[in-house]
Amino acid sequence: MILTNSKFISLSALIAVAIAAPVTSAKTFKMALGDAAGGTQWELGTKFSELMEKKTNGSVKLDLFPNGQLGNEQDTVNNAAIGLLDFSVLAINNVTPFSPSVGLLTMPYLIQSAEEAKKLTQGAVGDELVKNTIRDANVRIVGWAYSGFRVLTNSKRPVKTLEDLKGLVIRVPKNDIMISAYQAWGINPTPMAWSETFTGLQQGVVDGQDNPYITVHAMKFNEVQKYITNIRYIFSIEPLIVSESIFQEQSKDIQEAILSAGKEATEYSYQFLLESEDRIRKDLVAKGMVITEPADGEKEWISKVTKEVWPKFYASIGGKEKLDNTLKSLGR
């Protein structure tokens, strides 16, 4: 074969680059985030990335893709399950369709404080759910983000009672437990993909939604929502998952780094919530949002859900005994 001068120069350049390249180069993983930068998912992801780079002496790096750039949250579970995506941080309710027992953590009014959320996820309950997601979905939970209680927001009016809720069109995730909660409260919610939610609120397709204060702030929902009802029906927990196939392909050292970084990032996320939620709540008020407390300590909301919704999902979470034992572990 005869090489022209230009081809010879190009080939020489490639050889030079190959010779100059280090013997080992950093391994780069992709991490999907459903939320915008600045929220709980971003904080967990960036801390995990920093820790991984430190623990592996720079041999592992992570690229973060916020705002659903790599697909909606349920897509990321599916893609991780088949080895097309490395990591994802997502709302726990979007793991439930793939591993139903995880729905335990979204049973309305089960978790009543950040401390209880931490106790469940980092104790025996969390350990069992990790095993279940590996078995059911081929993804491994290696960390947890804590976002706080999902509060109700809307653009129409203050909501104190279930009567006030009637007539509002509320967006919910495509999650049977959450849909059933609103049905028990007397309305038919509108399931909508997370990536469509801001636009749906902006255009008036839906009147409201529910999410933690931190998420409301990060997604700038204050620009399209006026009223907040401080309900506490679900404590938002967002697991950090890794593809089990990809995890098993790694060396023992990298596996240990992933697990260790996940634990440390989890604790960081918990402290981030405790230190930032009140500040963020005040900032939302300063930006014009109005916070209303539900009437009578939320008793009507709680009664409807625990009587009508809990029994419907006993089987999927592992039985009524599973829920009873979880409540006992929390001292209730």
Where are these regions (language model features)?
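Bacterial N-terminal signal peptides that target proteins for export
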Residues: 1-11
